[in-house]
Design a protein with these regions (language model features):
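Active-site and adjacent substrate-binding regions of carbohydrate-active enzymes
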Residues: 1-642
Length: 642
């Protein structure tokens, strides 16, 4: 509804900030009513709501004024491309700066290595100041605008962004919205007794409300950090600490917190970040009597952030790191009239987990059962697809998906956990259980891609056949991530077949967290082996290089909501069709350790059966048979048929 008073306020703001950009005014005009309605829905009852809303509008204008001409030009180029992040051209890598290269200053020297592989989108793991020994890998932030000394400076980051931009590469960094370190300036001011800053966090005089809340709040780290509240002696209060005791949860019922954190989002946008990764968005709103995850207000806050960035910094996309149940993940793309106006990206954690499930069992039915949820993703948003990342693997797919495949959920998950943690006799995988809950026996999994695929144990045994099988598994897993829809994100070290790194056990700041086993320190002498034929590193690297090249050559794999999963004709073979109009490719993946066959009837899906197809991966030409004829796939083989 047109609101003359609000439009007048907008024009006064634009005038006072001396903004003459017609496109900015157009975007602001289109969004201001929704910005106000979302703000009022959350904060309308706050005694200073009107003044704080004015502060919010000012911060949007100021962010645009602060945006460089270069970035505004890049915004316009992205707008011209349309939804640039849906393209098949994007292939990413996630990395820790120190463990990959040393410092930010050293990263430009590593770009040729990444470009040779085909990577053009970098996710730099947390960069900002966090206390040594209490950093949670950089997710306990002490200062959102100061780069960790050992990594470099903001100037180094700006220079690196410029280097990426010159190479037409993209940058993603994290913002931790849910919490800060207890050494953050706001936490220090709260500890000093300043009430205004105590209201930036959740603090309680006694255990009454914490006890109530803990009845319904799941524990995140039950082993290393049980409970969701920590007693602070200096304050003589209980502080909400959902993750670790040194991470204080921010109180978003306080609009000042929202405006401050939005300012940090804008700061990152104006560094030239192409995608901001919002860590743990599911947790940002808390309410007694709930799990304090995935609440409606959390979505309203994310939508409000998206609207504000669409106005001031429109070239920056948002990734919501919501590792939640399959049905709930869809909500992070926005619902109803806000579909595709919340997060542009979400991690396809369900697809990642069901791929690991299929690899352990040789049975793809659970993967197939998950697809009707995943196919609900709206056109215009996309997945970030991956096989491994810095985090653990959670088996978060729904029980009914397991039951429909004929398995018992508890027993099935126990099998998967045992298979990958080395407790299952005969399993080649080498990983470990993470965050075991002694009450429920729930647990997640740590381990590198290569070690979970059996490479570590095969090398230990010097078993050449097992080494080759593990490489085949690695490439199978990566191939599915390349073609299943979304932007594939590799994890550093995986491109060279790095196995688990156990050096974390000797570091008191890391030894309690076995996820560090799959966060290697790159040995660049070893990485020279990616160019030496016959090495494991070379086999993995060159296969990935070829996969990326193939992906990039196929506009049909851009994420245009153009995927159709094949009906089950073999419990070990997952298959889907990617299509644009009459054009299609059929992708088949054998998750079994044995050769498998599938009927040529699959070629009828999405159009008339061709007489001949070419496997774009192997280069093989194949004559298409009748329904009673079968196409063969070797163990862990995949085919991309056109």
């Amino acid at each position: 509804v047109y609101n003359p008073a609000l439009q007048h306020k907008l024009h006064e703001l634009v005038k006072s900030h001396k903004i003459k950009d017609a496109k900015f005014v157009e975007r602001f005009t289109a969004n201001i009513d929704d910005i106000q309605s979302h703000f009022n829905a959350i904060y309308g009852n706050h005694p200073h709501a009107a003044n704080l809303f004015q502060s919010l509008l000012n911060s949007i204008c100021q962010a645009f004024v602060d945006r460089s001409d270069d970035l505004k030009k890049r915004d316009a180029q992205k707008e011209k491309k349309g939804q640039w992040f849906l393209s098949q051209d994007l292939v990413g890598m996630s990395l820790y700066v120190d463990r990959f290269a040393g410092q930010i200053y050293d990263l430009p020297g590593k770009l040729p290595y990444l470009q040779k592989l085909g990577v053009n989108f970098l996710h730099l793991m947390p960069l900002f100041k966090s206390p040594e020994g209490e950093s949670d890998g950089g997710y306990a932030v002490e200062d959102f605008r100061v780069v960790e000394d050992r990594l470099g400076s903001i100037e180094d980051l700006r220079n690196f962004q410029s280097a990426l931009q010159k190479e037409d590469m993209y940058l993603m960094i994290d913002i931790v919205l849910n919490h800060t370190s207890h050494h953050h300036e706001w936490a220090k001011l709260a500890k000093s007794g300043i009430k205004e800053y105590q209201e930036y966090f959740y603090m309680y005089e006694d255990r009454r409300i914490p006890d109530q809340m803990e009845e319904t709040m799941p524990e995140i780290f039950p082993e290393s950090s049980p409970g969701s509240f920590t007693y602070d002696e200096k304050l003589d209060k209980w502080v909400m600490t959902v993750f670790h005791h040194y991470q204080w949860d921010l109180n978003y019922t306080n609009p000042k917190v929202f405006i401050e954190m939005l300012g940090n989002v804008f700061f990152y946008a104006n560094l030239g970040v192409d995608v901001v990764r919002i860590d743990a968005p599911a947790f940002i709103w808390k309410q007694v009597g709930t799990s304090c995850q995935n609440l409606p207000e959390a979505h309203q806050l994310l939508q409000l952030i998206k609207m504000c960035t669409e106005v001031a910094t429109p070239g920056m996309a948002i990734l919501g790191e919501a590792i939640v149940a399959p049905a709930q993940i869809m909500e992070y793309f926005g619902t109803g009239r806000y579909a595709t106006h919340e997060c542009d990206f979400a991690y396809n954690a369900t697809q990642m987990a069901v791929q690991w499930d299929a690899l352990a069992t040789g049975d793809v039915r659970i993967m197939q059962n998950a697809q009707h949820e995943l196919l609900r993703k709206p056109l215009g948003a996309t997945w970030l697809t991956y096989t491994r990342c810095h985090d653990d693997i959670g088996l978060g797919y729904d029980d009914y998906m397991i039951e429909q495949a004929g398995f018992t959920p508890y027993d099935h998950r126990s099998y998967i956990k045992n298979y990958y943690s080395g407790a299952q006799p005969g399993s080649p995988a080498k990983g470990a259980l993470f965050a075991v809950n002694p009450k429920t026996q729930d647990a997640r999994l740590s381990g590198s891609l290569a070690s979970l695929c059996g490479l570590e144990s095969a090398i230990e045994k010097n078993d050449k056949a097992a080494i080759q099988t593990s490489i085949d598994k690695i490439i199978l897993m990566q191939a599915m991530s390349m073609f299943v829809g979304g932007v594939p994100m590799l994890f550093y070290g995986d491109e060279a077949g790095y196995t688990n790194d156990y050096s974390y056990l000797n570091d008191s700041g890391k030894s309690y967290d076995n996820r560090w086993m799959h966060r290697p320190i790159i040995n660049w002498e070893r990485n020279k082996s990616v160019s030496k034929k016959g090495t494991t590193e070379n086999q993995v690297y060159t296969a990935l290089q070829q996969l990326i090249k193939l992906r990039r050559s196929l506009p049909i794999v851009a994420d245009l909501k153009n995927i159709k999963w094949l009906e089950n004709h073999n419990n070990s073979i997952a298959g889907f069709v990617r299509y644009i109009g009459e054009e299609k490719i059929t992708c088949l993946f054998n998750f079994s350790s044995a050769p498998q066959e599938i009927t040529w009837f699959i070629m009828d899906s999405n159009g008339q059966r061709p007489a001949q197809v070419k496997d774009l991966w192997s280069g093989e030409s194949l004559n298409v048979g009748m329904d009673h004829d079968h196409l063969g796939l070797a163990p862990y083989q995949f085919r991309i048929l056109k």
